A protein has these predicted regions:
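Amphipathic alpha-helical dimerization/coiled-coil segments
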Residues: 17-21, 101-135
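N-terminal helix-turn-helix DNA-binding core of bacterial DNA-binding proteins
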Residues: 19-58
């Protein structure tokens, strides 16, 4: 079980990752769209709308809306399953693969330890000391 410090660290990584994602140019994905995208790229077998709905425990129409948005950004592509023409397979795209690679880099950056900011009093003292030594 994660300790409080580990949990806080994970929340910090999530926050840093989400901030980087919303600040960057290009696609701005909702949490659901990101979950669908990650499931498509991190699961080894091909995904279907029905399978994604079951895995994520959301309705098929919600998955369809998320896939519509992901397809707009060319992060996934849909293809009719040749083995069962009633089923739709969700395929990866080169742009989606690049997005996942960028996401991993963003998460690594967000996970790096951050320097502790000095307290205002300590900053003033350091500035005063610096001013005295430069005169």
């Amino acid at each position: 079980m994660a300790t409080t410090d580990e949990t806080e660290s994970l929340v910090g990584v999530l926050r840093g990752t989400m901030l980087a994602l919303v600040r960057r140019e290009g696609s701005d994905l909702s949490a659901r769209q990101l979950a669908v995208c990650l499931t498509c790229y991190l699961e080894s077998e091909a995904q279907t709308v029905r399978g994604l709905a079951a895995t994520l425990d959301v309705s098929k129409p919600a998955i369809t809306r998320a896939l519509d948005r992901l397809a707009e950004f060319d992060l996934v592509r849909r293809k009719t399953d040749p083995a069962d023409r009633r089923s739709v397979l969700v395929q990866r795209t080169p742009k989606g693969t690049a997005f996942l690679r960028d996401l991993r880099a963003i998460m690594k950056e967000a996970a790096k330890p951050k320097p502790v900011a000095a307290e205002p009093a300590a900053r003033k003292k350091a500035a005063a000391k610096s001013a005295r030594t430069t005169r």
